């Protein structure tokens, strides 16, 4: 825990998960059923990560009000900590040093030995900032650069903050999970979902299904929760995604709606 004036930065625990999750949800949509489900899934994710790692997020409080967050996960085989996001959602809390306080607190914490690294401190913090800031909001990529993060060679979107002198970050190449086609998935839409660090993930899945239903009235949709039907999710090989006629949809709706729907139609053979 660290404090600066009327601001205090606190590690997330089971006692303040609610504060962390609510910072992710727009105030005007707190009663939205999609976000309610998304928050439920985020709470499950945080609880699981706390049991596994002990520390995965911090919340900044300004005058006792949750004002900002930073989320991160250890990556033991790379000896680094990956920052998933840093977020100060409300304009009245901007330009008050909240983001800086959150990141500074994390940097201080990660200079100490960690059990998950055999008693050694991490070698670096790494992050891949994503766009989406509101008008007038400090872009995350600019913030991290101003805080001393440097671009990783060969990857303009990846930034690194070394904690050990001379450390050069070289990401481990990984293959993402691959969908295992199922006979039961033919002729329908199947949505796999489960615990997620971001409540928007479920909202985006809902929005994608809505677009599909509007484009293809009467299409059959099956939702599979990895929490409620773990065996069904596991045999398909992916933790989250949209499957159409036993084909995984790779296009993200918000990136390109037209391309998303085209991929759906092709999967259904309705080109």
Positions of PLM-derived features:
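Short amphipathic alpha-helix that is part of the acyltransferase structural core
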Residues: 1-48, 59, 199-200, 204-208
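Conserved beta-strand in the GNAT
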Residues: 59, 64-74, 80-82
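A conserved beta-turn-beta hairpin within the catalytic core of GNAT-like acetyltransferases
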Residues: 75-84, 94, 117-118, 184
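A short, internal acetyl-CoA/4′-phosphopantetheine-binding micro-motif in the GNAT/acyltransferase core
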Residues: 85-98, 129-131
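Conserved acetyl-CoA-binding loop-helix of GNAT-fold acetyltransferases
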Residues: 94-112
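Conserved GNAT acetyl-CoA-binding A-motif
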Residues: 110-136
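Local sequence-structure signature of Cys/Sec-based thiol-disulfide redox active-site neighborhoods
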Residues: 178-214
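Non-catalytic, surface beta->alpha helical segment in thiol-disulfide oxidoreductase systems
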Residues: 244-271
């Amino acid at each position: 825990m660290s404090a600066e004036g009327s601001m205090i930065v606190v590690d997330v625990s089971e006692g303040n998960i609610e504060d962390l999750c609510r910072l992710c949800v727009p105030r005007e949509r707190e009663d939205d059923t999609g976000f309610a489900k998304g928050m439920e899934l985020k709470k499950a994710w945080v609880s699981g990560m706390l049991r596994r790692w002990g520390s995965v997020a911090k919340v900044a409080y300004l005058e006792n009000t949750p004002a900002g967050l930073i989320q991160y996960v250890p990556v033991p085989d790379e000896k680094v900590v990956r920052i998933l996001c840093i977020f100060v959602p409300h304009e009245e809390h901007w330009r008050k040093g909240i983001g800086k306080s959150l990141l500074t607190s994390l940097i201080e914490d990660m200079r100490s030995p960690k059990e998950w690294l055999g008693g050694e401190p991490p070698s670096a913090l790494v992050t891949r900032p994503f766009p989406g800031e509101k008008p007038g909001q400090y872009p995350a990529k600019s913030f991290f650069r101003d805080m001393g993060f440097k671009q990783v060679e060969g990857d303009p979107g990846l930034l690194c903050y070394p904690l050990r002198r001379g450390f050069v970050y070289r990401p481990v190449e990984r293959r993402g999970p691959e969908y295992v086609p199922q006979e039961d998935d033919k002729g329908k839409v199947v949505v796999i979902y489960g615990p997620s660090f971001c409540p928007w993930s479920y909202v985006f899945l809902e929005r994608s299904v809505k677009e599909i239903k509007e484009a293809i009235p009467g299409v059959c949709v099956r939702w599979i929760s990895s929490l409620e039907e773990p065996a069904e999710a596991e045999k398909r090989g992916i933790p989250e995604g949209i499957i159409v006629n036993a084909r995984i949809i790779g296009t993200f709706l918000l990136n390109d709606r037209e391309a998303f729907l085209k991929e759906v139609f092709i999967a259904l053979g309705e080109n």
